[in-house]
A protein has these predicted regions:
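Strongly charged
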Residues: 1-91
Length: 91
């Protein structure tokens, strides 16, 4: 399902026009990004959590130059579904 499909389905289900639904989805996406950027996790009860996971520093190889590089410690965004969502998908 694409964002356009999601907008269409929500608009059809709620009776709200597509522009308003798209604005809400974009705003939600921006708020989640902003929260994660500032180090805050986002918890959506009954759906899941958008959290930051720490990746440890590691050594990697650049095979084209045959050199070793150090990738510093960093954080990546991660979605952790709630148990209810996991059970729904499992069937």
């Amino acid at each position: 399902m694409t964002k356009a499909d999601l907008v269409h389905e929500i608009a059809a289900q709620t009776g709200v026009d597509k522009q308003s639904v798209l604005a809400v989805i974009e705003s939600m996406k921006d708020q989640i990004k902003n929260s994660l950027q500032t180090g805050e996790n986002v918890y959506l009860r009954g759906f899941g959590s958008f959290i930051l996971k720490k990746r440890a520093a590691k050594t990697a190889r650049n095979i084209s130059k045959n050199t070793t590089i150090v990738i510093p410690e960093h954080y990546i965004p991660y979605f952790k579904p709630c148990k209810e969502l996991i059970e729904t998908v499992k069937g």
